[in-house]
A protein has these predicted regions:
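N-terminal pre-core extensions flanking Radical SAM catalytic domains
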Residues: 1, 190-191, 247
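Short, flexible loop/turn elements at secondary-structure junctions
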Residues: 10, 37-41, 67-69, 107-109, ...
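Conserved phosphate-coordination/catalytic loops
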Residues: 15, 81, 85, 253
Length: 275
C-alpha cells in the first residue's frame, strides 16, 4: 500500500482523523496521504498537516480543496456560510508549510458552472492567486441526473479547463503536486490519463481499457466495509471488523478474486476520476 485517500463526507469532521492517519503510517507501507476536503475547518486541517509531517518525516500530504464557483455561488450551492473564504484560508495556510504539504484546488465541472468556467478559472488563478488546480467532471449518481441539454456544454467546459491546466502546468504557472517525489509524479500522470479517458467516454459511455478496481485500489467505508470502488455497491468484499481489521485477508480472498473477475469479464467502465 503506497497511498491512502481520506475522503467523505467531510473527513475533518472526524476529530480523530490524526489518529486514523497515524494508524495507516504505523501499520502499512504508505508513502503519501491524499485528503479530499471542503475546507470548512481551516485550523483543524492545518493542525493535521503540522502533526503528521512532524510524526513522519517521509510522508507526503496532498489536500484536495473543493471550489466550484465564485464565492457567493459556491457558498450558496454548498449551503455553508463563508465556505469559499475558508477554502482560500486553508489553501494559504497549507501553502506556507514545507514542500511535503501540497494543497490543490479541485473544480468539478457541472451544469451550474460550465457556462462561466473561463471566468471562474481566471478568478481563482489571478484574483485568488491559486497556483495548484485540477478538475473533474460531474458524474450521474443516485437521484442526480445531468440535464441532457447541458451535457455537451459541460463536456466543452471540461475540455477547455483540462487543456488550460496542462498549458499552465507546462509553463509552471500551476504546480499541482510535489514532482520531486515518486507519488507526486504518479498523481500528476494519473490526472492526465484520467482526463483523456474521460473525454473519450463522457458523451458516449463505453469500455476503453480494463478497470483495476479491486487490485490497484479499493475503498473502505466509515463502517469498515471494503469495496472495489464506490460505484459497485453490490460487490461487498468484506468487513474489516469481522476480519480482525486484516485488510489483506479480505484483499486476497476468493470474494475479491470473483469481483475482479466480474469487473474484467463484464468490461465494467465509468468516469471514476477520484481513484
Amino acid at each position: 500500500l503506497l497511498n491512502v485517500n481520506l475522503t467523505g463526507g467531510e473527513p475533518f469532521a472526524r476529530k480523530e482523523i490524526v489518529d486514523i492517519a497515524k494508524l495507516y503510517i504505523d501499520n502499512t507501507t504508505i508513502q503519501s496521504i491524499y485528503v479530499t476536503t471542503n475546507a470548512s475547518l481551516p485550523d483543524r486541517i492545518a493542525n493535521f498537516a503540522e502533526v503528521i509531517t512532524d510524526y513522519d518525516k517521509k510522508i507526503d500530504l496532498t489536500f484536495q480543496i473543493s471550489i466550484d464557483d465564485f464565492p457567493k455561488e459556491h457558498n450558496k450551492v454548498r449551503k455553508v456560510e463563508n465556505l469559499f473564504e475558508n477554502c482560500i484560508e486553508t489553501y494559504r495556510k497549507l501553502k506556507s508549510m514545507n514542500d511535503r504539504v501540497t494543497p490543490v484546488v479541485s473544480v468539478t465541472v457541472t451544469h451550474e458552472n460550465c457556462d462561466n468556467m473561463k471566468n471562474i478559472f481566471k478568478y481563482l488563478t489571478e484574483d485568488c492567486k491559486i497556483d495548484s488546480l485540477k478538475c473533474t467532471i460531474v458524474r450521474d449518481e443516485g437521484v442526480f441526473k445531468t440535464p441532457q441539454e447541458k451535457r455537451e456544454k459541460i463536456f466543452n467546459a471540461y475540455c477547455w479547463l483540462t487543456d488550460k491546466i496542462k498549458e499552465y502546468s507546462k509553463i509552471k504557472k500551476l504546480r499541482n503536486y510535489n514532482l520531486k517525489s515518486i507519488q507526486g509524479k504518479l498523481h500528476s500522470k494519473k490526472d492526465e490519463i484520467s482526463w483523456d479517458l474521460t473525454k473519450k467516454m463522457y458523451l458516449n459511455p463505453k469500455y476503453i481499457s480494463p478497470c483495476h478496481a479491486g487490485s490497484l485500489f479499493g475503498i473502505i467505508t466509515a463502517a469498515g466495509l471494503v469495496y472495489p470502488c464506490e460505484i459497485l455497491e453490490n460487490k461487498l468484499l468484506g468487513n474489516l471488523r469481522e476480519n480482525n481489521m486484516n485488510f489483506m485477508k479480505i484483499w486476497d480472498s476468493t470474494v475479491t478474486k470473483e469481483a475482479k473477475n466480474f469487473i474484467l469479464k463484464s468490461k465494467c467502465n465509468c468516469t471514476y476520476e477520484c481513484a
